Amino acid sequence: MSNSDNTTFATRILDWYQIHGRKTLPWQQDKTPYRVWVSEIMLQQTQVATVIPYYQRFMARFPDVQALAQAPIDEVLHHWTGLGYYARARNLHKAAQQI
């Protein structure tokens, strides 16, 4: 693809998103890198409709990376209960502690 083809393609994708894209998901409101990061981890192998209530509860308890890093792993896992793939929660917690 030429640069002009790439630009045209990118413009078409962005135009489509403006018309059809979801813009009201919880992680799209008051967007921060932390909120997007948590949502992306939760959304791995899990449907959006399933993630939303878990995400909201998780954010209420762990509103920022510091709160997540300082929490005991058992509490993080408790808030993850029902989402499955618990390695995601353990790795998220470890990463928060590294940050």
Curated annotation (Swiss-Prot):
Q: Describe cofactor binding as the record notes it.
A: Binds 1 [4Fe-4S] cluster. The cluster does not appear to play a role in catalysis, but is probably involved in the proper positioning of the enzyme along the DNA strand.
**GO annotation terms (biological process):** base-excision repair; mismatch repair
Required co-factors: [4Fe-4S] cluster
- Look up the EC number in the record and give it: 3.2.2.31
- Supply the enzyme class, top level: hydrolase
The source's domain of life comes to Bacteria
Which SUPFAM superfamilies does its entry note?
Answer: DNA-glycosylase (SSF48150)
Q: Report the catalytic activity.
A: Hydrolyzes free adenine bases from 7,8-dihydro-8-oxoguanine:adenine mismatched double-stranded DNA, leaving an apurinic site
Q: Which Pfam families match?
A: HhH-GPD (PF00730)
Annotated Gene Ontology MF terms? 4 iron, 4 sulfur cluster binding; 8-oxo-7,8-dihydroguanine DNA N-glycosylase activity; adenine/guanine mispair binding; metal ion binding; oxidized purine DNA binding; purine-specific mismatch base pair DNA N-glycosylase activity
Q: Establish whether keyword DNA repair is in the entry.
A: yes
For this UniProt record, the keywords arranged alphabetically read as follows: 4Fe-4S, DNA damage, DNA repair, Glycosidase, Hydrolase, Iron, Iron-sulfur, Metal-binding
Q: Which residues form the active site?
A: 40 (proton donor/acceptor)
Self-association and partners: Monomer.
> Can you tell me which family this protein belongs to?
Belongs to the Nth/MutY family.
What is the documented function of this protein? Adenine glycosylase active on G-A mispairs. MutY also corrects error-prone DNA synthesis past GO lesions which are due to the oxidatively damaged form of guanine: 7,8-dihydro-8-oxoguanine (8-oxo-dGTP).
- What's the protein called, per UniProt? Adenine DNA glycosylase
What's the name of its gene? mutY
